[in-house]
Swiss-Prot record:
Chain's gene name: spmA
A GO biological-process term: sporulation resulting in formation of a cellular spore
Claim: Cell membrane is one of the keywords in the record: yes
Subcellular location: Cell membrane
Transmembrane portions of the chain: 1-21, 37-57, 133-153, 163-183
Species per Swiss-Prot/TrEMBL record: Bacillus subtilis (strain 168)
Pfam families: Gate
Protein name per Swiss-Prot or TrEMBL: Spore maturation protein A
Record keywords, A-Z: Cell membrane, Membrane, Sporulation, Transmembrane, Transmembrane helix
Matches recorded under InterPro entries: Gate_dom (IPR011642)
Biological role stated in the UniProt entry: Involved in spore core dehydration; might be involved in the transport of something into or out of the forespore or could be required for some modification of the cortex peptidoglycan structure.
Protein topology in the membrane: Multi-pass membrane protein
């Protein structure tokens, strides 16, 4: 479906440019956009490689395990349906740690694995379990300490102070994270009260 939308937008844009006489502008924009995409990609890759390397060092030194153990009691309360030693809990913690350090691209496969494990716990039903809904809410609004991708994009566009976004980002993600947990709990207890 998304492919159809993209192709439709492209075709409509090209037809409109031909009718409007601005096909030359479209041509220039395509090449300029391709150049920018390469520049931004290399900037993002370098920052991602750096932070993924730091995460690997933290993992091998045991720092990630210590941090995960510190977070486990809180995470266990968020996901009481999941046994503490279940693989889903490990994937959830790893996903949240990756998001916490602004590594959204690294967090995605961990999130998918967590969902697969929770689906197994749910008996492979098509309806999402309470834990799956909570994970989606928390994952979408996860608190981010270092917004790595945003910093990389700001660096690619020659920002003089690319890390100025850190403070506002922490505040915004803290508010959204707390808000997501409150809303998730509200609807959970409301549904529980109705007996569903």
């Amino acid at each position: 479906m998304v492919n159809i939308i993209w192709v439709s937008l492209t075709v409509i844009g090209l037809v409109f440019a031909m009718c409007n006489g601005t096909l030359q502008d479209v041509n220039e924009a395509v090449f300029k956009g391709a150049k920018e995409a390469i520049t931004i990609s290399f900037g993002l890759m370098s920052v991602l490689v750096f932070w993924l390397g730091l995460m690997k060092i933290a993992e091998q030194s045991g720092l990630l395990d210590i941090f995960s153990r510190m977070c486990r009691p809180f995470i266990s309360k968020l996901f009481p349906d999941i046994p503490p030693d279940h693989p889903a809990m490990g994937y959830i913690l790893s996903n949240l740690m990756a998001n916490f350090f602004g590594l959204g691209n690294a967090a995605t496969p961990l999130g998918i694995k967590a969902m697969e494990q929770m689906k197994k716990l749910n008996g492979n039903r098509s309806e999402a379990s309470r834990s799956m809904i909570t994970f989606l809410a928390v994952n979408t609004s996860c608190i981010t300490l270092i917004p790595t991708t945003v910093i990389a994009v700001r660096m690619a566009y020659s920002s003089k102070t690319p890390t100025d976004i850190v403070g506002p980002s922490i505040l915004a993600t803290l508010i959204s994270g707390i808000g997501a947990i409150i809303i998730d709990r509200y609807f959970y207890y409301r549904r529980k009260k109705k007996g569903r």
